[in-house]
Amino acid sequence: MKTQMNYAKEGIFTKEMQIVAQKENLSKDFLLENIACGKIIIPANINHKSLDPNGIGFGLRTKVNVNLGVSNDCVDYSEEMKKVELAHKFGIEAIMDLSNYGKTSRFRDELVNVSKAMIGTVPVYDAVGFLEKDLKQINAKDFLDVVYHHAKSGVDFMTIHAGINSRAAHIFKQSKRLTNIVSRGGSVLYAWMMMKDAENPFFEYYDDLLDICLKYDVTLSLGDALRPGSTHDASDGAQISELIELSLLTQRAWDVGIQVMIEGPGHMAINEIEANMQLEKRLCKGAPFYVLGPLVTDIGAGYDHISGAIGGAVAAASGADMLCYVTPAEHLRLPNLEDVREGIVATKIAAHAGDIAKLPKERARDDEMSKARQEIDWEKMFKLAIDGEKAKKMFNERRPDDLNSCSMCGKMCAMNTMNQILKGEDVSLA
């Protein structure tokens, strides 16, 4: 089976590449060159028939991922499908099913069947439920069976925590972290390694893993098991040692034509973000960087979508290629529909703010909004806003008598005042 990367290396411009080139207004040569060298990826499993392809990486708009899925405390697949609909409504490019309870294949199959967004999973979450074994009873090859079934079902990318091998685990043990390992998949693998006194199965059998990905053109999202879960732990030896391991695994995947993106922090002080983005790009030779936040403070409980959006904007401006959304429910509970909506909007704002910095052409929509404000064209403003529905609702809640202003400024609307005076008209505030 040939992958998007293999095709690009051969100079073959696939249907998926054509769609991405049109969406991003990029040339054929630019896209082929950067997919071939791994700086751009197009996650597109051959079995995901409903996919509307998107690219992630160098020279492209920053993409946004939405996490959803059930847990043992909240098993309501119908609500999770409503979250999918909400993600589609806002034009989200990626959705990850992080279900970690019970038999998840039916929901995953439905997700692949209906979603035009690329679908990601974390197979290790599904291991206990799929295999019907407790963690200690699972053997190394069992984990690969789960990966195979996820790949066959049509998921476009998988988070695989292959970098927390025995070397990285040794460095972690020597670190003095406040929050240890906060990655769910990473903590499960570390626990398995310790209980079995064995190497990480995804690292030990990495070539077998690559064979599975090659068969279905699954993109590897190399997970950061040792990402910092607190600002205190950011940029420490454990995090960086794993990143070095991921850089080596990236090259091995590229050698056989498998697309890769790298997952990143996490929690991180705002002044460390740019250096971390540059470090990933340097070590991993430009592989796309997919970050969770980063959250720039640890005390924003209930408002972590704001902490994440602040960090996400800086990360995107500094080179991050995809942002994983953070909701107000982060660290507290499974998010509800309103949490998901707020997380989506906050993260889309962060992604766009970053794009204005690194892709000047992305300012055009902002200029249109400014023009609409100057012209006091409310309908156009609602249309251009990231969440125009909420903008219109808020405007109408205190709708002004004179539509040449809003209820904030009334007759003292600066836009209206200047429009009148520059046309040579008198301004009356009475």
Swiss-Prot record:
Gene Ontology CC, one term: cytosol
Q: Main role?
A: Catalyzes the synthesis of the hydroxymethylpyrimidine phosphate (HMP-P) moiety of thiamine from aminoimidazole ribotide (AIR) in a radical S-adenosyl-L-methionine (SAM)-dependent reaction.
Name what cofactor the protein needs.
Answer: [4Fe-4S] cluster
Top-rank taxon, per record? Bacteria
Task: Supply one GO BP term.
Answer: thiamine biosynthetic process
- Its gene is thiC
Keyword set, alphabetical order: 4Fe-4S, Iron, Iron-sulfur, Lyase, Metal-binding, S-adenosyl-L-methionine, Thiamine biosynthesis, Zinc
Which major enzyme category is it?
Answer: lyase
Q: What is its EC number?
A: 4.1.99.17
The family line of this record is:
Belongs to the ThiC family.
Residues annotated for [4Fe-4S] cluster binding in this entry: 406, 409, 413
Q: Which NCBIfam families does this one have?
A: PRK13352.1, thiC
Q: Which residues bind Zn(2+)?
A: 267, 331
Chain sites annotated for binding substrate? 67, 96, 125, 161, 183-185, 224-227, 263, 290
- Give me the comment on cofactor binding: Binds 1 [4Fe-4S] cluster per subunit. The cluster is coordinated with 3 cysteines and an exchangeable S-adenosyl-L-methionine.
The record ties this protein, via InterPro entries, to: ThiC, ThiC/Bza_core_dom, ThiC/BzaA/B
The record describes its quaternary structure and partners as: Homodimer.
Q: Name one GO molecular function term.
A: 4 iron, 4 sulfur cluster binding
Identify the metabolic or biological route this protein is part of. Answer: Cofactor biosynthesis; thiamine diphosphate biosynthesis
Protein's UniProt name: Phosphomethylpyrimidine synthase
- Reaction(s) catalysed by this chain's protein: 5-amino-1-(5-phospho-beta-D-ribosyl)imidazole + S-adenosyl-L-methionine = 4-amino-2-methyl-5-(phosphooxymethyl)pyrimidine + CO + 5'-deoxyadenosine + formate + L-methionine + 3 H(+)
